[in-house]
Amino acid sequence: MKFIFSKSIIIATAFFLFILSQLPAVFLNFLNSNGDTYGIAHKNTPPFIILTLVVVTICIFIGIKCGFYQNYRKSLEWKNILLIFSLLIITFFIQKFVVQFITSHNLYNVSHQITNQMKVENILSSLLFPGQFVAVSILAPILEESIYRACFYKLFGYYRWTFFLSCFFFSYVHSGFSWDILGYLPLSIALTYVYHRRQVLTDSILLHALFNTLLFVF
C-alpha cells in the first residue's frame, strides 16, 4: 500500500509540474487575445517573466521536497562541467546534422511542423529578449528535466529501460509520431545520459539550459 501511495504521489507531481509548465504559455495567449498588438512585446514581457519565475520557484520547491536536488553541488565539479560542455558541442552539431538531413529529404510532417512552429513563434514573437531567454533557458530546462528525468526515474527506477523510456517520451512530447522525433533524439539521449549516470538533476538542467541558449542564439 505504501509503495502504491508513493508512486501515486510521483505521478501526481509529474502531472502538476506539467500543468505548471503550460501556465506561462496559456497566460501569454490570453494577453495576445485582446487584439491590441501595439507595443505588445513591451506589455507582455514583464508579467510573463514574473509568472514564469513564480512557476520556476514552485517547481524548485517541489523538487527539493521530492529530493530531486540532492547532491546538486556535484554539478560544479570541473570534470562534470567539462563533460557537459563536451556533450553540448557534440549534441549541438549532431542535432544540426539530423535536422538538415530531415529537411533536405522533405521528411518533416508538414502539419505538425506548422502547428509546433506557430506555437513557438506565438510565444517568442510577442516577447522581448529577456522574456524569450527566461522561457527558453530557464523555464523549459527546469520543468522538463524535473518531469522527464527526475519524475520518470523516481517512478520507474534506475534501469536501462527507464533510460529509453525517458528518451522516447521527451522526444515524443516535442515532436509526436513523425520524422521530427529524430531531431530531438540527440538532445534527449544526451540529457538522459547525464542524469542516468549519477542521478544529479542539476547536471541535466545545466546541459538543457546551455543547449537551448545555444539554439536560441544561433
Curated annotation (Swiss-Prot):
| GO terms under biological process | CAAX-box protein maturation
Q: Where are the transmembrane segments?
A: 8-28, 48-68, 81-101, 123-143, 163-183
Manganese recorded as keyword? no
The Gene Ontology terms for molecular function here are: endopeptidase activity
For membrane topology, the record states: Multi-pass membrane protein
Q: Name one GO cellular component term.
A: plasma membrane
Q: InterPro entries in the record, alphabetically? A: Rce1/LyrA-like_dom (IPR003675)
> Where in the cell?
Cell membrane
Concerning its family, UniProt says:
Belongs to the UPF0177 family.
Q: What is this protein called?
A: UPF0177 protein YaiF
Keyword Transmembrane helix: yes or no? yes
Q: Which UniProt keywords apply?
A: Cell membrane, Membrane, Transmembrane, Transmembrane helix
